[in-house]
Design a protein with these regions (language model features):
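Basic nucleic-acid-binding alpha-helical/helix-turn surface characteristic of O6-alkylguanine DNA
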Residues: 1-158, 209-212
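Gly/Ser/Thr-rich beta-alpha loop segments that engage phosphate groups in nucleotides
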Residues: 14, 128, 145, 158, ...
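Short clusters of hydrophobic/aromatic residues that line enzyme substrate/ligand-binding pockets
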Residues: 118-122, 164, 189-192
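LysM (lysin motif) carbohydrate-binding repeats in extracellular/periplasmic proteins that recognize
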Residues: 158-161, 202
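Regulatory, non-catalytic segments
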Residues: 161-171
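…primarily DNA-binding HTH/wHTH and HhH modules…
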Residues: 174, 185-212
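Short, small/polar-rich loop/turn modules that mediate ligand/substrate recognition or access, typified
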Residues: 178
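Short, basic, alpha-helical segments at the C-terminal edge of helix-turn-helix-like DNA-binding modules
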Residues: 181-183
């Protein structure tokens, strides 16, 4: 199962999920259109989501599971791959809880301007092209931005700007995989899963000095 919890941030409530001792989800809990991300994880990992704590004491609604909503990014297919097998449930459950705690703590440090780099182990689930885009996103430095055209060129597909943008939308690990650092070629903010206000806040935060 994928253990999940909700975590409040200045940008809104984030839905965190862990599987196999790695973080597989950090997405915007209040955006219904993001349900396709949850569905992709369930199908790619062949598991379902389960809340943590088990008593449901965390506020808000969790993942809705598989729905009939079509995947807008074309990754809703049996060829979706993942860097994980089926871990032992007991040991994995403890590891997943530790990962969720660590992710929440590092997010708090990030929003408090006390952290610039995350070291939580990540698990991505997507097509080879999507995962190549996400890997490239992790190379964009804190405080910097890149364009969709730059990403496409770096991947060797300069005309695949729309495909790169779609892969950004499909990113299940917001902030940890910093798709908010991607802007239009003219510097415009363009879109963002958490909304433009959240993107503006994140980019503004990353231009503040690091507090010790």
């Amino acid at each position: 199962m994928i253990r999940w919890c909700l975590h409040a941030t200045p940008c809104g409530v984030l839905r965190l999920g862990a599987f196999g001792g790695r973080l597989c989800l950090c997405d915007w809990a209040d955006v219904p259109a993001r349900d396709f991300v949850v569905r992709r994880l369930e199908r790619g990992l062949h598991v379902r989501f389960a809340p943590w704590p088990d008593d449901g004491s965390l506020s808000g609604s969790g993942p809705r599971g598989i729905s009939d909503t079509p995947d807008p990014d074309g990754s809703d297919n049996p060829d979706v791959s993942a860097n994980s097998g089926d871990p032992d449930s007991g040991e994995s459950d403890h590891a997943d809880r530790c990962v969720l705690d660590c992710a929440a703590r590092q997010l708090d440090e990030y929003f408090a301007a006390q952290r610039r780099v995350f070291d939580v182990p990540l698990l991505t689930v997507g097509t080879p092209f999507q995962r190549a885009v996400w890997e490239l996103l992790t190379t964009i430095p804190f405080g910097a931005t890149r364009s969709y055209a730059w990403l496409a060129a770096q991947l060797g597909h300069p005309r695949a700007v729309r495909a790169v943008a779609a892969a950004n939308r499909a990113n299940a690990l917001s902030i940890f995989i910093p798709c908010h650092r991607v802007v239009g070629s003219n510097g415009s903010l363009t879109g963002y899963a958490g909304g433009l206000a959240a993107k503006r806040l994140l980019l503004g935060l990353e231009h503040q000095p690091l507090l010790r």
